Amino acid sequence: MSYRELVVELAREHAEALSDALLDLGALSVSVEDADADTPDEQPLFGEPGLVPDRTAWQHSRVVALLSADHEPAVLLAAAANEIGLAETPKFVVREVEEQDWVRLTQSQFEPIPIGERIWVVPSWHDAPDPDALVLELDPGLAFGTGSHPTTRLCMEWLEQSVKPGQSVLDYGCGSGILAILAKKCGANPVIGIDIDPQAVESARQNSERNRAEVTYGLPDACPDGEFDIVVANILSNPLKLMASMLASKVKPGGRIALSGVLARQADEVAAVYARYVDISVWREHEGWVCLAGTRRESH
């Protein structure tokens, strides 16, 4: 059986309503994406620490609906547009989607990933290429972080070089838990992972259990008081700037901090905010992204 994708670009205020209408009218699934993704106009959605995002779509949104072959896309879209009160039916594109073995296709797209000197990120359906390496078993899922993105890779390379056995580590914005798990496998103790998304926290817990890595996870209000030898945050530049004072305060005097999720063109601006608290600079750049790393100044 073949399927079709109906792709519509429209303003944020109509995206959620159109999505609901398409589902009501028989769409098999609907997703909302940033129509400006991977461009300078990309708009990440995020909440303040401890809060969920207050927006569910982007200013310039792309609605993608999966339809069975017996649905006529133009008719369905016209009905959905009428249902939500749009004066005109939005422009759209239709893409053919052939029936496939989706599990096998998904698995074929995720091969073991070598990172740094001795790290392998390995999906559960693969054997580790080097059993003696530092192996993290991680499947792609709902939470961000499989090692394939440059920012995750940069943070992992930094942790591999920086963590010493017995050091305490805070992973703020832990996503899948990949950085916290790596820190634990490098000998860190204790390791804490914090995320604003309860689904990410649960995913991280499951990944830690699979990797036999003892990490404590929680939402921001569960973040323990006190300071850590190492703080790592792979988020995005805007929330990193907003949380600079809080994140810096979690680093012990003389301790280290690593920040990623920062484009190379944003590095100076982020570094300037953190320079009030830590001596910080670009540690490494990869594919247009950077990892900033620094040391908290000793108290006098």
From Swiss-Prot:
GO terms for molecular function: protein-lysine N-methyltransferase activity. The keyword S-adenosyl-L-methionine applies. InterPro entries: Ribosomal_L11_MeTrfase_PrmA, Ribosomal_PrmA_MeTrfase, SAM-dependent_MTases_sf. S-adenosyl-L-methionine binds at T152, G173, D195, N234. Pfam families: PrmA. It is found in: Cytoplasm. SUPFAM superfamilies: S-adenosyl-L-methionine-dependent methyltransferases. It catalyses: L-lysyl-[protein] + 3 S-adenosyl-L-methionine = N(6),N(6),N(6)-trimethyl-L-lysyl-[protein] + 3 S-adenosyl-L-homocysteine + 3 H(+). It is an enzyme of class 2 (transferase). Its main location: cytoplasm. GO terms for biological process: methylation. Its EC number is 2.1.1.-. GO terms for cellular component: cytosol. Keywords: Cytoplasm, Methyltransferase, S-adenosyl-L-methionine, Transferase. HAMAP family: Methyltr_PrmA. Methylates ribosomal protein L11. PANTHER family: ELECTRON TRANSFER FLAVOPROTEIN BETA SUBUNIT LYSINE METHYLTRANSFERASE. Belongs to the methyltransferase superfamily. PrmA family. This is Ribosomal protein L11 methyltransferase. It comes from Burkholderia cenocepacia (strain HI2424). The lineage of its organism: Bacteria, Pseudomonadati, Pseudomonadota, Betaproteobacteria, Burkholderiales. The gene is prmA.
